[in-house]
Amino acid sequence: MFLVDWFYGILATLGLWQKEAKILFLGLDNAGKTTLLHMLKDERLVQHQPTQYPTSEELSIGKIKFKAFDLGGHQIARRVWKDYYAKVDAVVYLVDSFDKERFAESKKELDALLSGWSSLAHCFLFLDNWVTRIEHPICCLRKMNWRYHMGANGASPLARGKVNLADSNVRPVEVFMCSIVRQMGYGEGFRWMSQYIK
């Protein structure tokens, strides 16, 4: 089996074989998870009803084929988040920047999610979904404010920057500003995430 895995790994590295990964879309209700999933799948911007039951979609981004799980963000759905996140390669956590009143609630859910860090996915991609146009100076301020509220600055066991998964129990994390409506920013986040997909 080692030889087969090695061979397919070489093909994937050379771009001759498509990688496969499971990712989990999490965040409070109305953060944009289902909208992002459908934008990635077929580039359709449609207003969705709140996700009541877990759904999954298959999509390709670059040379990676993803099976994406959208569990919903309402209080009942949050109870099953931990049942899924140990079985995926990456977690995409969305926050609606416009809804500042819910930052504390989102942080509480994030803290609960990260409490079982030993079984975390390989990486965490945080997307700060801002509906309006992204402009650099404002973007930086929002990013710092978001990290403050979310506790994403130096939070162990997560680390920003390039992380070698083989040498550490630390999981890579990065925050990207995005606007799903304007189709901006999230592509960079998924490119960052793809480097950690085996």
From Swiss-Prot:
Q: Name one GO cellular component term.
A: endoplasmic reticulum exit site
Protein's membrane topology:
Peripheral membrane protein
Q: Which SUPFAM superfamilies match?
A: P-loop containing nucleoside triphosphate hydrolases
Subcellular location(s): the record lists: Endoplasmic reticulum membrane; Golgi apparatus, Golgi stack membrane; Cytoplasm, Cytosol
> GO terms for molecular function, please?
GTP binding; GTPase activity; metal ion binding
* Reaction equations catalysed: GTP + H2O = GDP + phosphate + H(+)
Q: Which residues bind GDP?
A: N30, A31, G32, K33, T34, T35, N129, I180
Q: Which residues bind GTP?
A: N30, G32, K33, T34, T35, N129, I180
> PANTHER family in the record, alphabetically?
RE74312P
What family is this?
Answer: Belongs to the small GTPase superfamily. SAR1 family.
Q: What does the UniProt record say this protein does?
A: Small GTPase that cycles between an active GTP-bound and an inactive GDP-bound state and mainly functions in vesicle-mediated endoplasmic reticulum (ER) to Golgi transport. The active GTP-bound form inserts into the endoplasmic reticulum membrane where it recruits the remainder of the coat protein complex II/COPII. The coat protein complex II assembling and polymerizing on endoplasmic reticulum membrane is responsible for both the sorting of cargos and the deformation and budding of membranes into vesicles destined to the Golgi.
User: What's this protein's name?
Assistant: Small COPII coat GTPase SAR1
